[in-house]
Amino acid sequence: KKEARDRGLWNLFLPDSDYGAGLTNYEYAHLAEVMGRTHFASEAMNCSAPDTGNMEVLVRYGSKEQQDEWLKPLLNGEIRSAFGMTEPQVASSDATNMEATAELVDGHWVINGEKWWTSGAGDPRCKIIIFMCVTNPENERHQRHSMILVPMDTPGVEVKRMMHVFGYDDAPHGHAHMKFDNVKVPYENVILGEGRGFEIAQGRLGPGRIHHCMRSIGAAEVAFELMCKRSMERKAFGRELARLGGNFDVIADSRMEINQARLLTLDAAWKMDKYGNKVAASEIAQIKVAAPIMACNVIDRAIQMHGGAGVCQDFPLASMY
């Protein structure tokens, strides 16, 4: 991290900002792909999720007090953060179903509810959660929710368990199942204002999807390279694996699919820069589907080409998948 910062490779993700490198979404997308080639690059350059999205929220929507208390240490890499949106009892594809609540009592928010897949909450450096919940149930359905800053050490905040993905717990970062029991924070901890949670979410999730998709493309490129290397070095029945069955077709399909996903994602990034997140909503939705499907397909093919080695610790393919 120190070397990355000394070289100016720090907070590269913040577009049009005095805090970062001033890169556009399109420009940063290429860097995100390179960072996706290894699991620690984003961490080294202070460009890890969910901190990137949380910092963008605080830059765009946070008050000066919120920025001084939480944005500055995040930008300096001194602390980590979490994002709490998904809940265990409702369909996460429809966030208007959210059940967690915050009630205003004597100038404080009293928060109750559960969240899971709370990204970043397992990191011991995590000090703050951006928590989305219902604050104004009487409003129109997309104006009922707010985002509130909740310090991790607030009484009533409990990490119930860490969620595993295919057996991997993503330590030391991780995704937590959390409970919030009468958690009390000042009214001033609400970001932007009451009922503006969805407005913030749309601003937050667009750039994050560019980052995630391009990192997935970077990972797919690594899997592709490993697949090509293995297919030419490994022999069966006197021939290289690449020359058996339809393996050349598998390699060719992977090359085309990676290129297609990259171009689709870069198009979305360009459109966000030129016209804004709202106009680019369709393209952002497309890449959220296309890039992960492509990455899963390419990594799966690479695993198959490696045989048993593909699912063991000797190669990164299993954890990438």
Regions found by a protein language model. Give the residues of each.
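Short, conserved phosphate-binding/catalytic loop or strand-edge motifs used
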Residues: 48-55
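A short core secondary-structure module
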Residues: 107-108, 112-160
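A short, Trp-centered hydrophobic/proline-enriched beta-strand micro-motif
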Residues: 77-86
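Flexible, small-/acidic-enriched active-site or ligand-binding loops
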Residues: 97, 155-184
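Short glycine/proline-enriched turns and hinge-like loops at secondary-structure junctions
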Residues: 23-25, 93-96, 121-126, 140-144, ...
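Flexible, glycine-rich active-site loops centered on histidine and acidic residues
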Residues: 55-61, 83-84, 138
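Alpha-helical interface subdomain recognition
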Residues: 1-42, 46-48, 61-66, 73-78, ...
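Glycine-rich phosphate/pyrophosphate-binding beta-alpha loops
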Residues: 91, 116-123, 207-211
